[in-house]
Each structure stands twice: as C-alpha cells, then as structure tokens.
C-alpha cells in the first residue's frame, strides 16, 4: 500500500497549523519532519520546539527524520515531543549508538527506522533491520 508523507520543511512556519490542516484534508497519511543540524548535513532546519507545537496542532502520524550528528543524544526528546516514528541515519554514529537510539524510541512506544545517504551502500542497514519497522 502506498502512503503519502509530505515534508513540512517547505511549509510557511507562520501558518504551520493551517498548512498541516490543508495537508491532512488533502489526504496525506503522515507528516514527514526533517531535522538537520548543520553538522551531519550542511543545512539547519527545525527541532524539538517546533515538533511540540506541531503535535498540539494535529493528531496525524509524524515521522521524524533525524539528519543529525549522534542522534542517540536526542532520541528520547524527539519521542517525548510528539514523534510517532523516528528514523536514524546509520552513518550518523556508531552501530552501538544507533541501536541504542532505536531501543530508546521503541522503549517509549514509538516506531523506529533507519535511513542512509545516497552514496551509502544499501547493505549498511542490514544489522538494524531486525529492530526497525
């Protein structure tokens, strides 16, 4: 089954609640919430305070994509701020810490996933597959 998960990164943040409502009314299944720290990737985007506000504005499923260095440091905070699922880049930390981050998310009742950069071999996700959705 195909699911549609538009990223809110292109939204007008002054009108975020309204734009999320429009996305939901258009039939989106999830919201994709891109988090960039300027370290793991060159750009900087939104974070925990925006996620908390977004969670108050919608009951849609929110997939938080952490494009950040050492995501284990923030896994719990993003889960508690309103993420329904958190996806972690396997390149962002050691295998041990990515597994720990996945465990944190799952321990808080959230779904977890892993993602890779375009140039990373697909096989890099194999050690994590038993623990993710």
Q: Each predicted region: which residue ranges?
A:
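Conserved N-terminal beta1-alpha1 strand-loop-helix module at the mouth
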Residues: 1-87, 92-100, 104-112, 125-132
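Membrane-interface helix caps and helix-loop-helix hairpins in membrane proteins
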Residues: 120-124
